[in-house]
Amino acid sequence: MSKKQRLSEEDGEVEIELDLGLSLNGRFGVDPLAKTRLMRSTSVLDLVVNDRSGLSRTCSLPVETEEEWRKRKELQSLRRLEAKRKRSEKQRKHKACGGEEKVVEEGSIGSSGSGSSGLSEVDTLLPPVQATTNKSVETSPSSAQSQPENLGKEASQNIIEDMPFVSTTGDGPNGKKINGFLYRYRKGEEVRIVCVCHGSFLSPAEFVKHAGGGDVAHPLKHIVVNPSPFL
């Protein structure tokens, strides 16, 4: 057990501990330099306590811009799906129809004369379209490599047969030869000729005028079918 005794001095009251410990200053439990020592100061005012809260997510784009980017991506994906659906529907309709597209059918033929004379002129102008049939033929490995080339040639020939090359020469003072090809059309549609020099869709009467000719009663008589340079 330790006892404490209070003594009055000039500096004030000093608390002395009486125990069995040794003291180098001659007085038990008294440190004469206790009041002269400086208090330790620190540059840190308060201790920083980390509450370990989750860090906020950072990104290179603002929040609004990121939301707009996501919406744009969703719209693009929806447009792609819509385009794929339309292509599949077109292919399905084309297969259902069997690809039946006639180059010459009854309909309005530009600004030509009567319907009966116009139809007879178109029939004499265009070559007959041959129907292509698919035949299963056993091929060797060497001939199998040439199948893509043959298919490409057949496709180009079918296109050329459907859209033959035509030309006309104007009989006016500024007459010149104009080349083009007959653009395929369906039943009830107007005959159109694509001008090679400008890429314009013209009626037979406009095609003759484009070559420098005047107004003619039967413009199809002035248009000549030429052999294709690709055959």
From Swiss-Prot:
Quaternary context: Forms a heterodimer with AFP2. Interacts with ABI5/DPBF1, DPBF2, AREB3/DPBF3, EEL/DPBF4, ABF1, ABF3/DPBF5 and ABF4/AREB2.
Localization terms from the record: Nucleus
Basic residues bias (residue ranges): 83-96
Domain of life: Eukaryota
Chain residue ranges for the region called Disordered: 83-152
Provenance organism: Arabidopsis thaliana (Mouse-ear cress)
Protein name from the UniProt record: Ninja-family protein AFP3
Known function: Acts as a negative regulator of abscisic acid (ABA) response and stress responses.
Biased amino acid composition, Polar residues: 130-152
Pfam family membership, one: NLS_NINJA_AFP
Annotated Gene Ontology cellular component terms: nucleus
Induction, per UniProt: Up-regulated by abscisic acid (ABA), glucose and salt.
Taxonomic classification: Eukaryota, Viridiplantae, Streptophyta, Embryophyta, Tracheophyta
PANTHER family assigned to the protein according to its UniProt record, in alphabetical order: AFP HOMOLOG 2 (PTHR31413), NINJA-FAMILY PROTEIN AFP3 (PTHR31413:SF31)
UniProt GO BP: signal transduction
N-terminal signal peptide: none
Keywords, ordered alphabetically: Nucleus
